[in-house]
Amino acid sequence: MSASLGATRFRPDLLSLDDLDEAQLHALLTLAHQLKRGERVANLHGKVLGLVFLKASTRTRVSFTVAMYQLGGQVIDLSPSNTQVGRGEPVRDTARVLGRYVDGLAIRTFAQTELEEYAHYAGIPVINALTDHEHPCQVVADLLTIRENFGRLAGLKLAYVGDGNNVAHSLLLGCAKVGMSIAVATPEGFTPDPAVSARASEIAGRTGAEVQILRDPFEAARGAHILYTDVWTSMGQEAETQHRLQLFEQYQINAALLNCAAAEAIVLHCLPAHRGEEITDEVMEGPRSRIWDEAENRLHAQKAVLAALMGGR
């Protein structure tokens, strides 16, 4: 059988989940599901994806690489250590040149503004492989995992506890777009960007979802179908580690928090995890964990993203 996006058309770049409307997001999830089942999609033979990763990566790098190979394309590593990016060449210059050589870029960098500059000058599809502001490909995989478990997305509730970071931003937008309620619980001073929360609330008003920004993790977890967390200290924040360990101590996914959730609740984590900090070993290895399915789904989600953005060019 052949997988297809049907008549759905996409913008050239995926810089934010807000670059996808509700129909496009559902189409991506359906395509990812079809690809996971082994259905074929128009391949990317002869296409080359450049990886510009200014941050360390395991899952994102490997899944993009394998996805591209499985779709018939190739990958080239354009990380700072082996390009002039690491020696201070302006982004606009690098982007203009890469746009003449490769067919798409997956970029992992510290600043969303830098990603946007690549997209502005490259003239080819640019995919957000993680910035300080969002991690959209991760959340496409998360939503795929949730849909596999519950058979639906609308009407569910996700509780995110921890730092209101890039993953939280993409979850807010993604959940709102599919009609899934989301409650985010963070310590004071670590809430998500108010502009992202406001945008998610606006979208939720159309889709019937609810968006809550809370302090109490147990209030957030009450009745939730999905518990989700991320590391308390992200890359680039290592100097804050001890301070954050104290502030986030009550924001751990453990047996007590899981008991507040719905009886059928599952647990997700974007990885890597610091076991014993944001999540206990017991929960990670327990029957409610879907973390390894979630990690696998990065591959299928990113195959769908690559096919959608690069397949018709």
UniProtKB/Swiss-Prot annotation:
InterPro entries: Asp/Orn_carbamoyltranf_P-bd, Asp/Orn_carbamoylTrfase, Asp/Orn_carbamoylTrfase_sf, Asp_carbamoyltransf_Asp/Orn-bd, Orn/put_carbamltrans, OTCase_ArgI
Residues annotated to bind L-ornithine: 166, 230, 234-235
Catalytic activity, as annotated: carbamoyl phosphate + L-ornithine = L-citrulline + phosphate + H(+)
Pathway terms, separated by semicolons: Amino-acid biosynthesis; L-arginine biosynthesis; L-arginine from L-ornithine and carbamoyl phosphate: step 1/3
GO cellular component: cytoplasm
GO function term, MF aspect, one: amino acid binding
One matching Pfam family: OTCace
Enzyme Commission number(s) from the entry: 2.1.3.3
Main location: cytoplasm
Chain sites annotated for binding carbamoyl phosphate: 57-60, 84, 108, 135-138, 270-271, 298
UniProtKB keywords: Amino-acid biosynthesis, Arginine biosynthesis, Cytoplasm, Transferase
GO biological process terms on file: arginine biosynthetic process via ornithine; citrulline biosynthetic process; L-arginine biosynthetic process
Subcellular location: Cytoplasm
Annotated signal sequence range: none
Function: Reversibly catalyzes the transfer of the carbamoyl group from carbamoyl phosphate (CP) to the N(epsilon) atom of ornithine (ORN) to produce L-citrulline.
Record family assignment: Belongs to the aspartate/ornithine carbamoyltransferase superfamily. OTCase family.
Classification via PANTHER family: ORNITHINE CARBAMOYLTRANSFERASE, MITOCHONDRIAL, ORNITHINE TRANSCARBAMYLASE, MITOCHONDRIAL
Summary of subunit composition and partner proteins: Homohexamer.
Name the record gives this protein: Ornithine carbamoyltransferase
Annotated source species: Gloeobacter violaceus (strain ATCC 29082 / PCC 7421)
The organism's taxonomic lineage, starting at the top: Bacteria, Bacillati, Cyanobacteriota, Cyanophyceae, Gloeobacterales
Gene expressing this chain: argF
